[in-house]
Amino acid sequence: MTTQLDALRNMTVVVADTGDIDAIKKYQPQDATTNPSLILSASSLPQYAPLIDEAIAYAKAKSADKTQQLIDAEDKLAVNIGLEILKIVPGRISTEVDARLSYDTQATVEKARKLIALYNEAGISNDRILIKIASTWQGIRAAEILEKEGINCNLTLLFSEAQARACAEAGVYLISPFVGRILDWYKANSDKKEYAPAEDPGVISVTKIYNYYKQYGYNTVVMGASFRNVGEITELAGCDRLTIAPALLKELQENSTALVRKLEFKGEVQAKPQPLTESQFYWQHNSDPMAVEKLADGIRKFAIDQEKLEKMLLEKF
C-alpha cells in the first residue's frame, strides 16, 4: 500500500524541517532545514550535549574574548548539528544566519562565509549546504553576492510576491515561501476562522509563486515551508520541494489516501520582466500588510530564540 508520503516523494523532494536526528532517521528525507528555533529545541535533547561541549571547547580555543567566544560557539553548534544531520540525509542541510543581521548585507555575507568555512573545515563541500537568510532587501542582496561565490542560499521568511520576484532576479538557489504563518495572519485578522486547503491563503500564495517562476523560466527552487496541517501539504503536491515537520511527516506516512499532483506548469515560458528596483520592491512588499507584519515578526522570533540559545550556552561556559 502506497502511503501519501511515498506518493509525495514521487512528485516533490521531501525535506525534514527539524534538527532532531532520530526523526530524520525515521522519515529519510532528501534534505533537512534548521533555524534558530529548531537549533534551540534540538540543543535540549541529551544526545546533543557532546556537540554543545565541543562547540564551547572550540570557541574557547579560538579566542580569549568572551563576546567572541559566544559568537563562535553558537556558529559552531549550528554547524555541529548540521554535520550530524548530513551523516543521514543524502542531500543538503540548511543552516541559518543570525536573524539579527537581517538588515545588514555585509554582516550577512561575512557570517555566511564563516558558516561555510566551518563546514569546509569538517570536509563538507558547498554543494551540500544552503545558507538560510531572511528575505529582506538586504538579505537578498547578500544572497546575490554569495551565489556568485558558489555559496547557495535558502531565502526564508518569504511572504510576498515582491520578495519571491526579487529572489529569483538575484539568482538565489532556493526560496522558502511560508504557508502556515500566512494562514495564521488571516485567521487573526479576518472574520473567517476556517479555510479549506484549496482556499488557504498560504497555499494560494505558494501556488502563485510557483507558477510565476515557471512562467518566466526562473531556476530558483520553490520549497514550501511552515505547514499547519496535512491539507496544506497535499494541496502543494508537485511543488519543487516541501520542508515538513516530523509530526506532519508521520501523518503522511500513516495515510494511504490517493495523492493528486496539484502543481505542474504546462504553459509556454515567457520573457523575464525587468528586475525590481529597491523602491519598487519596498512599494510592492509594503502594500501587503500580512507580508510586512509576518516578515518582521519572524525575524523577531528567530532573534529571541537566538538570544535564548546564547543564554543556554553561557550557562555551560
Curated annotation (Swiss-Prot):
| Gene Ontology BP, a term | pentose-phosphate shunt
Q: In which pathway does it act?
A: Carbohydrate degradation; pentose phosphate pathway; D-glyceraldehyde 3-phosphate and beta-D-fructose 6-phosphate from D-ribose 5-phosphate and D-xylulose 5-phosphate (non-oxidative stage): step 2/3
- Asked if Transmembrane is a keyword of the record, the answer is no
Q: What is its EC number?
A: 2.2.1.2
A GO molecular function held by the record:
transaldolase activity
Name a single GO cellular component.
cytosol
Write down the Pfam families for this protein, in alphabetical order.
Answer: TAL_FSA
Catalytic activity line of the entry:
D-sedoheptulose 7-phosphate + D-glyceraldehyde 3-phosphate = D-erythrose 4-phosphate + beta-D-fructose 6-phosphate
Q: Which family does it belong to?
A: Belongs to the transaldolase family. Type 1 subfamily.
Query: Sorted alphabetically, which PANTHER family does this protein's record hold?
Result: TRANSALDOLASE
Q: How does it assemble?
A: Homodimer.
Protein name (record): Transaldolase
Species the sequence originates in: Histophilus somni (strain 129Pt)
